[in-house]
Amino acid sequence: MANSKYISGLDLTDLMVPTKAATVFAAQEASLYMSGGLVPMIDVPAGSTQIKVPKLAAVADPTALTAEANPGVDIDTVIPVDSAVNIDLGLYATRSVVRDIGGISTDEIGRVLGNAIASAFDKKVTTQFASLTTQELSGTAPAGSLAVSDIFTAVGTIRNTGETGELFGIVSAGAYGELMGNIGSSAFAGGEFQNSAMRNGFFGRVAGIPLFVSSYLNDTDMGTSSKLPVAAIMSKDAVKGAMQGGVKLEIARRPEAVGFDIVASVAMGANVIDSTRGVIIQDAS
């Protein structure tokens, strides 16, 4: 909504409140991962720049015992060996300069800033997928394209590690068209999730797992120049993210620009917790 009351530093509260609401809404809606629905998000206490995520090893299957039997098992032998993975926070910020010419739309400012925050957020999370268990394309499809058999193989690899939980997949925008052409859209069933990016990005299930499209699953954003990633299949134990305080917004008068600086920021990070719980399918040929 345009409002001339914001000009020359008047009614900053009227500018701050709707702009922040629009920014937070846009960021949450545009991000696949910020909500924690796919990649779990951990809240980091204020003042901390790092959080340790515990990783517990699996223990052997229990042995059936009778009432008369002497277990003969030291409790130490059944305690899993634990370790911790660090997630370091980085500060991501974007700025918009609003001039004193009237006609300020808080919804539009919030949409642009929120989308920029969501982009940085999703790129950071997607970069971690490069450290998952690698799988080369099967070669049954044209170079750089994804076949259904590749997804089946990845699911089998993850299940073979003992992972029995829910899996999900992220498919690159480049591989999406070829995959849909291979199997036909009629083979897919719809799904309902909690934000618009997950609803719009979701395009079906293969091997029982929901698949989503992401434009950030590529060699440029992931820094894998010699390997072209086409899909990532994983459980929620593979990669986790961390965030401190959510999306923030600050507004300050900038006389030299004859307007305001509106800065949106988020403190977040992500890391691979267990690379065996996920597979990155790539074309390294």
Task: For the regions a language model picked out, list residue spans one by one.
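Protruding loop/beta-arch "assembly-hinge" segments enriched in small, turn-prone residues
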Residues: 1-35, 205, 235-237, 241-285
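Assembly/oligomerization interface modules of large self-assembling protein complexes
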Residues: 17, 21-89
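Short helix/loop capping segments that flank catalytic or ligand/cofactor-binding pockets
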Residues: 61-64, 178-181, 271-273
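Helix N-cap / beta->alpha transition motif
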Residues: 88-100, 170-175, 233-235, 274
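Alpha-helical scaffold segments that mediate packing/assembly in large oligomeric complexes
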Residues: 91-165, 280-285
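Short alpha-helix boundary/capping segments
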Residues: 101-109, 225-230, 247-250, 254
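Extended oligomerization regions of viral-like shell subunits
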Residues: 149-245
